[in-house]
Amino acid sequence: MRNVGIAARGILLLTVLFSSGCTTVDYVADAGARVKAADWSTMETVDVTLEEYSYTPSKLRFTAGVPYKLQIKNEGTEKHYFTATEFFKAIATRKVQSNADGEIKAPYFSALEVFPGRSLDLYFVPVTKGSYPLHCTITGHEAKGMAGTIVIE
């Protein structure tokens, strides 16, 4: 199976909703319809870089209703998490893609783990306006400054 090969090679690990103990009630109810209705030809691309121990930029801004591709690149020497549980609850997710290696189509995520020298692309439509915390859940990384904010306007 292609997705198993990706995980086995250490290219990408996704923490999916059901493994985190969350329920679908917490997430955008009509996510599939919102993704389908979006005009992906107008998609905006936003880049964020992960390094020891930061997100650059540390504040990400998105407009509700606009389709996005968030390119998450780990230019560090350690693996890092892009953990933004409340943000993931506020968006309609289309898919996560790992370079040319494959993609995972799942409606719900709580975190993305990106290995050194690798990248992930998150395709989504922001829905619920607000300010959401972002941090790396690896012990000590947030304390060293690996935190940020995601705003949906």
Where would I find each of the regions flagged by the language model?
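Bacterial N-terminal signal peptides that target proteins for export
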Residues: M1-I11
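C-terminal motif of bacterial Sec signal peptides marking the signal peptidase cleavage site
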Residues: F18-G21
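Beta-strand cores of secreted/periplasmic/IMS beta-sandwich domains, seen most often
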Residues: S58-T83, S119-T128, I152
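Short beta-strand and strand-turn-strand segments in soluble, beta-rich domains
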Residues: N99-P107
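Extracellular/periplasmic metallocenter environments
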Residues: T23-A29, S54, A106-E153
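Short aromatic-acidic-glycine turn motif
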Residues: F88-N99
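N-terminal edge beta-strand
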Residues: A38-P67
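A eukaryote-biased signal for short, well-structured alpha-helical docking elements
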Residues: T24-S41
